[in-house]
Amino acid sequence: MSNKMWGGRFGEGPDRIMEEINASIGFDQRFFAQDIRGSKAHCRMLAEKGIISSEDAAQIVAGLDVVLAEIENGTFHFKRELEDIHMNVESRLADLIGAAAGRLHTARSRNDQVATDFKLYIRDTIDHLDEQLADFQRALVDRAEEHAATIMPGFTHLQTAQPVTFGHHCLAYAEMAGRDRGRLADARRRLNESPLGAAALAGTSFPIDRHMTAAELGFDGPTRNSLDSVSDRDFVLETLSAAAIAATHLSRLAEEIVIWSTPGFDFVRLTDGFTTGSSIMPQKRNPDAAELVRAKSGRVIGDLTSLLIVMKGLPLAYSKDMQEDKEAAFDALDALSLSLAAMTGMVRTLTVNETAMRNAASRGFSTATDLADWLVRALGLPFRQAHHATGALVAKAEKKGTDLDGLTLAEMQEVEPGITDEVYSVLGVDNSVASRTSFGGTAPDNIRAAVRRWRDELGS
């Protein structure tokens, strides 16, 4: 029995194992909307150029509308023996309209067809992710406005460093999400060239109009080299790279939420909706949503790495290896989308323990830098000398079992005789935070101004 798709070249059908390893319909069926959209554009162009009749084109477009409706309402039957979404759609089209369906593939290969489908899919997905990232930013900005003056410890090395505000911390992640949106927008701009009409690899002898199909599909224009058109997966790699960075940002916040939820910190409390219990320990409230966001970032990074490895040794133009691009992309982008939804929900609904945050900020000598700065401003000491004196005062306070403001003036003057009682005005966390007025600093007024800028930018 000859193969139905490849015609007379083959005397018998594929081995069962070959059919199984070769089939992609189990995952590329999610291209159905993009595949049908691309086929309609190609069909209309063929008719416009006189390559097929307008009557055949009308039948094809009407038949594709029926196929689309069947897939959307769940009555379409996908067949593994037809390999992929392209042949499943074409086969059903032939059932519906007969021989005219065979004219659709004129001047087209599955190589340029799948590249077109994939670009349309990635473009649609980028648009969806951008909306999710913007919603995530809005959630962060809302919490930043609410907690513009809520003092918490800022950390380096997960050790108390300087007091900051929780609003400032939230806006740090809004900045990260903004860069993520920028990277995805850059990827979208670069991918927005249509490979349709490149055919298998060398172009076609039919008088097609690639500019027409590119315009109908919303591309900026056609790709300029047919070999590159069908072998390019940079647009997937670039999108997955941006996705991996975004997932890494979410993972960092997830890690902080996990830490902050522990009794040792007690900075935040997730709602019951984003936690789980234990089958044996009745007291447990586990931050599983945050932990899963943290874990899914590893999957996204792994999917990017997987696709890079698939592509690294492929000669031009198309190789079947490239069928392995889709599952990695689907998995990564699905994981990022779900992680964004979960993280946005957690940010919107978590409860902030302002007392615990403030108490933690007041411990660990978090105003030591403020003391050093005061020594520079009030006494004219070089910063390095002020830094050394402050370190000695920290050691003295640590030995005494108190914070810096627990040292007496006499004890401070043992280290630096010029210190006056004015020093106590800079040792409180409120004054410390309020003094950080440099652009981008943590002062509450800065945070409120930043919130206004973000609301203008996000339209909220």
From Swiss-Prot:
InterPro entries: Arg_succ_lyase_C, Argininosuccinate_lyase, Fumarase/histidase_N, Fumarate_lyase_CS, Fumarate_lyase_fam, Fumarate_lyase_N, L-Aspartase-like
TM ranges: none
Pathway(s) of this molecule: Amino-acid biosynthesis; L-arginine biosynthesis; L-arginine from L-ornithine and carbamoyl phosphate: step 3/3
Lineage: superkingdom: Bacteria
Annotated GO CC locations: cytosol
Keywords: Amino-acid biosynthesis, Arginine biosynthesis, Cytoplasm, Lyase
GO molecular function, one term: argininosuccinate lyase activity
Broadest EC class assigned to this enzyme: lyase
GO BP terms in the entry: arginine biosynthetic process via ornithine; L-arginine biosynthetic process
Stored SUPFAM superfamilies: L-aspartase-like (SSF48557)
Main location: cytoplasm
Reaction equations catalysed: 2-(N(omega)-L-arginino)succinate = fumarate + L-arginine
E.C. no: 4.3.2.1
PANTHER family linked: ARGININOSUCCINATE LYASE
Family under the similarity heading: Belongs to the lyase 1 family. Argininosuccinate lyase subfamily.
Protein's recorded name: Argininosuccinate lyase
